[in-house]
Curated annotation (Swiss-Prot):
Protein name: Ferredoxin-like protein
Span of domain 4Fe-4S ferredoxin-type: 56-86
GO BP terms in the entry: nitrogen fixation
Function comment: Could be a 3Fe-4S cluster-containing protein.
Length: 97
């Protein structure tokens, strides 16, 4: 009997999200040019919620956020983002298995 290998993408696909429309729990603060920490978020966020737009500004789309806290830890000192937990009942719904 051989154990099949399950890809991480397949496991993450099982998660569900209840989006609180119009009330994102992460906001990028206004900036003239993105700090090194903001630019790092475009690479280190496991859910790929951060991207650089055509104007060179870092934007966040929190709908697929896994609430892991990577961005919170990275930007805590600089204050580049405002991060709070989603309202009760909203956010990621993890499905294990």
């Amino acid at each position: 009997m051989t154990a099949s290998v399950v890809r991480i993408e397949d496991k993450l696909y099982q998660n569900r999200y209840l989006v609180d429309a119009g009330r994102p729990h992460i906001k990028v603060r206004q900036h003239q040019s993105p700090s090194p920490n903001l630019l790092a978020l475009t690479v280190v966020c496991p859910a790929k919620c951060y991207e650089v737009n055509e104007d060179g500004q870092v934007e966040v789309i929190a709908d697929g956020c896994m609430e892991c806290g990577t961005c919170r830890v990275l930007c805590e000192e600089s204050g580049d983002i405002d991060w709070s937990y989603p309202r009760g009942g909203f956010g990621v719904l993890f499905k294990f298995g």
